[in-house]
From Swiss-Prot:
Classification lineage: Eukaryota, Metazoa, Spiralia, Lophotrochozoa, Mollusca
Residue list for modification Tryptophan amide: 54, 74, 94, 111, 135, 151, 158
Biological role stated in the UniProt entry: RPGW-amide, KPGW-amide and TPGW-amide tetrapeptides are involved in control of muscle contraction and may function as neurotransmitters. These peptides increase tension of the pedal retractor muscle and, in conjunction with FMRF-amide, increase peak tension of the anterior byssus retractor muscle (ABRM).
Extra remark: Tetrapeptides may be further processed to GW-amide, which is found in cerebral and pedal ganglia, by a dipeptidyl aminopeptidase.
Protein name: APGW-amide-related neuropeptide
Length: 196
């Protein structure tokens, strides 16, 4: 019983020592992290520092002002239009969108023009399924089985397949019948040798 009590006392002392040492380390680590954050904030506030990829910012700009800095790759945005009206900025790669398309649904890059002012009123044009980029032109006269871009008329690895050729089919059938005839003659000769 006494050994159990001694063991529990030693175990509890070790636990408190470990907890105290870990809390000291964590408090030192927090202080060190806060110091580095303060140093970086002071560096950015004292000098006109910029992050990598953000490009140069003019000396007139103050870090504390409310000007929206643009992200890398977004290009220049005019401030006159931004002040006069709220314009939704385009993402890189989307290119210019004309003001006539501004209210319409924007198309993704690579999709090209899908509507025309002359054909918008026609219900036939609106009923045509638009093709995705890379699918090529599909004729409107008859329904074409949709295939993946680059496959052509046959799946890759199949080689050229000609149309129905009756001569080749007849030749294959003749060769198969000839092989069956040879097998039958061999079987007949073996049966005669065994007297069956």
């Amino acid at each position: 019983m006494e050994t159990l009590n001694i063991f529990l006392v030693i175990f509890s002392l070790l636990g408190t020592i470990i907890i105290a040492s870990s809390s000291d380390e964590s408090s030192e680590r927090k202080k060190r992290d806060l110091d580095t954050i303060d140093d970086t904030n002071n560096d950015f506030l004292t000098a006109d520092k910029r992050r990598p990829g953000w490009g140069k910012r003019s000396f007139d700009d103050d870090i504390l002002n409310n000007l929206d800095k643009r992200r890398p790759g977004w290009g220049k945005r005019s401030d006159m239009l931004f002040d006069s009206e709220e314009i939704e900025k385009r993402r890189p790669g989307w290119g210019k969108r004309s003001s006539s398309l501004y209210d319409d649904e924007k198309r993704k890059p690579g999709w090209g023009k899908r509507s025309s002012a002359l054909l918008d009123d026609l219900s036939l044009y609106n009923s045509i399924v638009k093709r995705r980029p890379g699918w090529g032109k599909r004729s409107d006269t008859f329904k074409v089985d949709i295939r993946r871009p680059g496959w052509g008329k046959r799946t890759p690895g199949w080689g050229k397949r000609s149309g129905p050729n009756m001569c080749m089919d007849f030749q294959d059938e003749i060769l198969q019948l000839y092989k069956l005839l040879n097998e039958a003659e061999k079987l007949h000769s073996e049966c005669e040798a065994l007297n069956i």
